[in-house]
């Protein structure tokens, strides 16, 4: 058994974010996404797809590690079209590999975490 590795997966309907418009639900979004994520997603006409993808990554991260962590302590970004994950305020240190895909009305994310000893 490999104790320092974890895997998380999450799938979400993009329409959940389409129905919950940012302009009308700012407090909801600010409880989940840090400023850099909000700024990134809101640049796009179809921001719901971006928000759903980032949410799926955050859920997958939470499932891949053993400690409880808040959404705002997980920050996602992109480098050359690949998701990057950073955690703030964690008892442990981790490396992450994340993958994200969108298809029709779904976003799915898979995250592999490695606890650094």
Indicate residue ranges for each PLM-predicted region:
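Core catalytic alpha/beta fold that binds nucleotide/phospho-ligands
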Residues: 1-117
């Amino acid at each position: 058994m490999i104790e320092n590795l974890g895997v998380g997966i999450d799938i979400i309907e993009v329409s959940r974010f389409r129905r919950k418009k940012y302009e009308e639900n700012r407090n909801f979004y600010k409880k989940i996404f840090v400023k850099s994520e909000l700024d990134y997603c809101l640049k796009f006409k179809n921001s719901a797809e971006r928000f759903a993808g980032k949410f799926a990554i955050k859920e997958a991260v939470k499932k891949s590690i053993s400690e409880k962590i808040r959404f705002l302590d997980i920050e996602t970004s992109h480098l050359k079209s690949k998701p990057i994950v950073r955690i703030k305020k964690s008892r442990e240190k981790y490396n992450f590999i994340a993958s994200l895909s969108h298809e029709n009305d779904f976003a799915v994310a898979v995250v592999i975490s490695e606890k650094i000893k």
